[in-house]
Amino acid sequence: MSAKWINSIFKSVVLTAALALPFTASAFTEGTDYMVLEKPIPDADKTLIKVFSYACPFCYKYDKAVTGPVADKVADLVTFVPFHLETKGEYGKQASELFAVTMAKDKAAGVSLFDEKSQFKKAKFAWYAAYHDKKERWSDGKDPAAFLKTGLDAAGMSQAEFEAALKEPAVQQTLQKWKAAYEVAKIQGVPAYVVNGKYLIYTKNIKSIDSMAQLVRELATK
């Protein structure tokens, strides 16, 4: 067997190994595709959290085309959990309260947050459309009742029903949990996607729905 032929085989083996490497090694890098939070979100194992605000244009865009498909692709590993950011927008507090109530209503009814019947989804997209498409500002913070009415009407809920549900312990617990959203949002703004409460995805480096889902799957099993 000639030395030249042996060398040719060796090169072929090395090339084959190099080509196989991307399929066996991680395609994602800490510091480039994601970061580890110094202060993890508590009680968030096996979740994909999205920190968002009704007043965030990119949150609206992601919710129209990205969030649902990604959540669906990773549903076998993580549960999607929205965290509304109370500190953004003139009516962040009112939005958080109705979102927490509608999430509880959807859960009790066994309705997915992505379902067209979801009260959470109806209120969210009513505010998104009013704020970003119609440029509605509800008197710039001076008319919380009008802002709330937009969400309530979309969700098909009365003011009395909302006020009663807001007092429920589960709703108050959700609002308390959402306070952790502020520290996460300070890092790169919103939307902010967090896997298992500790891995923050760098949204600027998301290439596609499939690659984002792949990253979530990898982080969920770390």
UniProtKB/Swiss-Prot annotation:
Gene3D superfamilies given in the database record: Glutaredoxin
CDD domains with a match to the protein in the record: DsbA_DsbA
Main location: periplasm
Sequence similarity: Belongs to the thioredoxin family. DsbL subfamily.
Quaternary structure note: Interacts with DsbI.
Key word Signal present: yes
Annotated SUPFAM superfamilies: Thioredoxin-like
GO MF annotation, one: protein-disulfide reductase activity
Domain (Thioredoxin) ranges: 28-221
Protein name per Swiss-Prot or TrEMBL: Thiol:disulfide interchange protein DsbL
Species of origin: Lelliottia amnigena (Enterobacter amnigenus)
Record's signal peptide: 1-27
